[in-house]
Curated annotation (Swiss-Prot):
Species annotation: Drosophila melanogaster
Gene Ontology CC terms: extracellular region; extracellular space
Protein family: Belongs to the glycosyl hydrolase 18 family. IDGF subfamily.
Gene name linked to the record: Idgf2
Protein's job: Cooperates with insulin-like peptides to stimulate the proliferation, polarization and motility of imaginal disk cells. May act by stabilizing the binding of insulin-like peptides to its receptor through a simultaneous interaction with both molecules to form a multiprotein signaling complex.
One GO process term, biological-process aspect: imaginal disc development
Predominant subcellular localization, coarse grouping: secreted
Source taxon at top rank: Eukaryota
The keyword Phosphoprotein is annotated on this UniProt entry: no
Protein name: Chitinase-like protein Idgf2
Amino acid sequence: MKAWIWFTFVACLFAASTEAASNLVCYYDSSSYTREGLGKLLNPDLEIALQFCSHLVYGYAGLRGENLQAYSMNENLDIYKHQFSEVTSLKRKYPHLKVLLSVGGDHDIDPDHPNKYIDLLEGEKVRQIGFIRSAYDLVKTYGFDGLDLAYQFPKNKPRKVHGDLGLAWKSIKKLFTGDFIVDPHAALHKEQFTALVRDVKDSLRADGFLLSLTVLPNVNSTWYFDIPALNGLVDFVNLATFDFLTPARNPEEADYSAPIYHPDGSKDRLAHLNADFQVEYWLSQGFPSNKINLGVATYGNAWKLTKDSGLEGVPVVPETSGPAPEGFQSQKPGLLSYAEICGKLSNPQNQFLKGNESPLRRVSDPTKRFGGIAYRPVDGQITEGIWVSYDDPDSASNKAAYARVKNLGGVALFDLSYDDFRGQCSGDKYPILRAIKYRL
């Protein structure tokens, strides 16, 4: 009898350990379908990734500014060319896969209605019902398994460098608040968002649809999320624990964009600009660890260096000059896909190039805490300096290991189109995705 009890106990422990870190949530930016050149991700390319993903988040539907209803931001692709249906139909080939439609994200830019997501929270009930019904209709009509809310809230103001004077006070002041208050009505918006999520969940419950929440980069969870209340409303939360510093937000200094842990504090780094702080905060509020997915980016943030940035490349790097030029694949200044980054590192094809074509110097992270760095300083021959903070397969694997140690639900990958989906780096397609899957 004692042997049987011991066997049962061990079996339960094993089941619990295998249940944790089982999610690999893959974000799919459908705008990659319309890119030109090597960044164009077609459905056959997408399908290769699905064997590794537990969930696919289709991005992005938007919020129509005029009536605050959910809608496809590219109806020609999503509806008339049947991309919604083409992607959800892949579940027949990959029956383990759940496909969710994401509303919001940082793609939904509307200069005429810049505050529309807050307007929805503050709006009349009839407008909120219109949003909920329109979102439900998209999910139901096109065969999605649920809805993801990548809700837009005001972001923390960018970090600023301060001298030693007043440093201790500023660190305490910013610990939970960011640099400055950006929303004087945040407490009210927190209540309103919880009520909206509750109503969305009620609309999805009868069909058994999933509801997830994406916490976008630099959104302060203490301001906007009633975490204990959300626990009973969402199936899981994806924390976008990256882009803590970017060349757009921090044009004059470069630093780690997505460290797991807080780097040394001697350079006035804020305590909350790392993945562990964000995870620990959600856990401290009673949110179950197995409902948290750790966000990992498949791209790097790239700053333009100047002659005053120095030659060593050790962060914090001063006197940078905003975003580096866009890459051939990502086509966004200051952002390089992993395929673009690995192509710039030293290899047999570029190791003898000089000047502005010379390869980047890779700086490894023996601590496995902060992620990779690569740079090319400005010197006598080089006028186009660049400094990149990024995750490669090794550092992404370290983050998957962190998720396991913390008993998290898994990892959320942002996104498939910036991984090396063509296998240009090592011959393996989706090397970051694979590295995470093999470590979970």
